[in-house]
Amino acid sequence: MYAIIPQQIPQGKRAEINEKILFAINSGKDMIPAESIYNCYTGIGGLHNLKQSDFASYHEYAEAKKEFEMGQFFTPHEVCRDMVDVLSPTSSEMILDMCCGMGNFFNHLPNQHNAYGFDIDSKAVAVARYLDPDAHID
């Protein structure tokens, strides 16, 4: 299990940090500790660089934002931990996260071998597979 280390990553640095993390994962070298990846990868949510004032209506802005972000929102680590604590799954129960993103929930499960997840964001899936190699992630 990776420790939750609160991070304050400036909005302007998030895309750069995400790309460095993905480069490290794709290179196959342990260039960045997995715990740092868990705490620093933020996905594409909020990285759209769109301004509402550039659109005729809020609806048009929201649609453009949705198209870029694919509706992505990573549940905060603390919320994932607390939800798993409340559910208290046993190590024999199978868990499915149908929008697993980077696999935040998997970090707190008692048995990674019984964790299943999928996501439409291939970059988030790559991070999830790296962080939780025993989980079944597509």
Q: Which residues does each predicted region cover?
A:
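Class I S-adenosyl-L-methionine-dependent methyltransferase catalytic core
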Residues: 1-138
